[in-house]
Amino acid sequence: MRDKNTSHNNSQKERIHEIPDLDIIDLENDDLESSFHSSQEESSLPSPSPKEAAGRKKGILSRINIHIVLLAVFLLSIVGIVYKIKTWGVFIDLDEIFKDGPGDYSDTFDVILPLTNADGQPVYLDYGEGTSILMFGNAPLADDRDSEDNLANMIQEMTGATVYNCSVSGSYLAALSPTLNPEEYPMDVFNFYWLCVLAMADNIDDSFRRGVEVLGEDAPAEAMDVFHTLKNVDLNTVDIITVMYDASDYLAGHEMYSDQNATDIVQFTGNLEAGIELIQQKYPNIRIIVLSPTYAYGINEKGEYVSSDIQRYGWDVLSTYVIKQYASCASRSVTFVDNLYGTINEDNADDYLVDHLHLNVKGRKKVAERFVYALNYFQDSGNTSSTEGSR
């Protein structure tokens, strides 16, 4: 017993004096401090729930899907644009289109009106042989004046009428000055309005002569012939007055129209309306037929022919001049023959012009035929009567 107790006590003493294993920590070690804090932070952060983890994964996939969709739309747009460019329209052979010629314009600004009486009622007359026609204008009527190929002479031949050709080469429809001033603007004495005044009164005879004197050698060769014709013709015997000026006003950049003053003579349409107004007031039994300019080419800075629907000279394109002239004639109830779209147009101009402006013989004949068409438009109506009875 004693021995057992003795051995038991000895073993307890051994355990009491047994020194455990210890780790020595260096408190000045920075790595240890950082690892300690990081471990604390990791342990303090809550771990994501399974739902949150699934949501994050779904959000990433959604963003990826949107980008893919946008990329696909962009690529499809590019493909569509390329396809449209390559397949735009249908290639057409112009030679095939015009193999039978350029065709005819079916839409024109023609306004064919009969003469009207004091009550505004139409008077249909038969303009056959014995009809008297007085013509104003410039190159279309003045070129080759003494030739059978002259436009006025062609009309005389086609109608059997007596034609007084008072056109003046190199003249314009629009005046350069609102008042007659032969010293500074001598060519103004030849425009339509002042020629009408010359034919109806004696108060500008001296101004006309002075204009011719100022021009000297540059005066139109027919100037004094026109003067004497207008002073001697009896307007009471005239049945038709015809007015035709070419595109010279457009090419010179002359003013076109005025909304404030319809009879402003420095305007292309105003000068025409002023002359028409004068005729209708003093000679209401005269039918007025206005022939528009035919097509003419514009000329660019290089001297090249260009479309007159593109080239402007201060105001507008040629077609606008013609359309404004049509509106003026409609407002005055006079006949308007649209030569720009109905006679000589951009498609066939090369066949009827000798240059960018002047008519060849075929062109004059075509214009003459259009005039005769307008002159006799109402002849088959059954209501026509002799021009002698209308005077």
Model-predicted regions and their roles:
Residues 2-164, 378-391:
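N-terminal secretory targeting modules
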Residues 124-125, 221-236, 280-282, 377-384:
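Surface-exposed acidic, glycine-flexible loop patches that form ligand/cofactor-binding
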Residues 132-137, 162-167, 239-244, 287-292, ...:
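Structural recognition of the beta-strand scaffold that forms the well-ordered cores
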Residues 139-143, 256-266, 311-315, 352-359:
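Second-shell loop/turn segments in exported
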Residues 142-254:
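Conserved SGNH/GDSL esterase-like catalytic core that processes O-acyl groups on lipids
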Residues 242-256, 276-316:
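Active-site segments of SGNH/GDSL-like serine hydrolases
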Residues 272-276, 322:
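Generic structural signal for well-ordered alpha-helices
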Residues 293-391:
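Catalytic His-Asp segment of secreted/periplasmic serine-dependent ester chemistry enzymes
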